[in-house]
Design a protein with these regions (language model features):
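Short beta->alpha hinge that forms the Motif I/post-I loop of the SAM-binding pocket
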Residues: 33-34, 66, 90-92
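Rossmann-like NAD(P)-binding element
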Residues: 53-82, 86-88
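Rossmann-like NAD(P)(H) cofactor-binding subdomain of soluble oxidoreductases
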Residues: 74-124
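Internal alpha-helical scaffold of NAD(P)-dependent oxidoreductase catalytic cores
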Residues: 128-215
Length: 275
């Protein structure tokens, strides 16, 4: 079998490394609309060969490792794939992608979301072992072909990932809280500091807490714009719930009600019981 990867940034490039190490594919080829990224990916050995988009469509298994809106646009150009082909997307929001799949390739399609990654992006961000022990969420498998489901499972298990099945609407609701909201908060924290009179002085004092909280603000704005747009309603609901918590904490501090504030923080401590 031959594998093709569309998008050779962090997720696609790291996947290329994982598939090559797994060794089940005769070759792993790639395409990136950014010619410099494609050249760099080849230099870094992320894929065996970089080709034109149409050549990737001839592969047995095709991975879409690009921003969510790019995935939707790309799927509309993929109706010429082999009847037996397996198309696997790695997008961070699922419902809109699934809603826009051309009917002729719905059985070919597997909606997957690997819960891994870093704040870095581009081919240079690719790392070996990114998918090892990572949780991969597979959505709406009942609408995918039996053969395609088995191939996808074999691949992800082969690169040492863990699998869970979920409905796409449930996925989008849940990841709004554990993935999308943290990025909103990280961008907000970074901008709050950058808009102060002397941000450099403030940041010179930064320790582990600030670095942990602001790390995600380094993430790709274009990728996250797509995710926020495609999961808009769930992201807004998560922001609303978080705003309510912040407003409550603010009110307790304003009113010198530190007992309530302590109870609130103690309740948050219980999160660690689940992690």
């Amino acid at each position: 079998m031959k594998a093709g990867i569309i998008g050779l940034g962090l997720m696609g490039g790291s996947l290329g490394l994982a598939l090559q190490e797994w060794g089940r594919f005769k070759s792993v080829i790639g395409y990136d609309h950014n010619a410099l990224h494609a050249k760099l990916a080849l230099t870094l050995g992320l894929v065996d060969e970089c080709v034109e988009f149409e050549k990737v469509l001839e592969c047995d298994v095709i991975f879409l490792a690009i921003p969510v809106e790019g995935i939707i646009a790309c799927l509309k150009k993929m109706t010429s794939v082999k009847k037996s082909a397996t198309i696997i997307d790695l997008g961070g929001a699922k419902a809109q992608i699934i809603h826009n799949i051309p009917k002729s390739i719905r059985k070919n399609f597997i909606a997957a979301h690997p819960m891994c990654g870093t704040e870095f992006y581009g081919p240079k961000a690719s790392v070996k072992g990114l998918y090892e022990n990572a949780l991969v969420i597979l959505c709406d498998l009942e609408d995918s072909g039996t053969e395609q489901v088995e191939i996808a499972k074999e691949i992800f298990l082969g690169i040492k990932a863990r699998l869970i099945k979920m409905k796409s609407n449930e996925h989008d609701t849940h990841v709004a809280y554990i993935s999308h909201l943290p990025h909103v908060l990280s961008y907000a924290l970074a901008n709050s500091v950058l808009k102060q009179n002397d941000p450099e002085m403030i940041l010179s004092l930064a320790g582990g807490g600030f670095r942990d909280m602001s790390r995600l603000s380094k993430s790709s704005p274009l990728m996250w714009k797509d995710i926020f747009k495609q999961n808009r309603d769930n992201v807004l609901e998560a922001i609303k719930k978080c705003e309510k918590e912040i407003a409550q904490a603010k009110a307790w501090i304003e009113n010198n009600d530190y007992e309530s504030l302590v109870e609130w923080m103690a309740q948050a401590n219980k999160l660690q019981e689940f992690m």
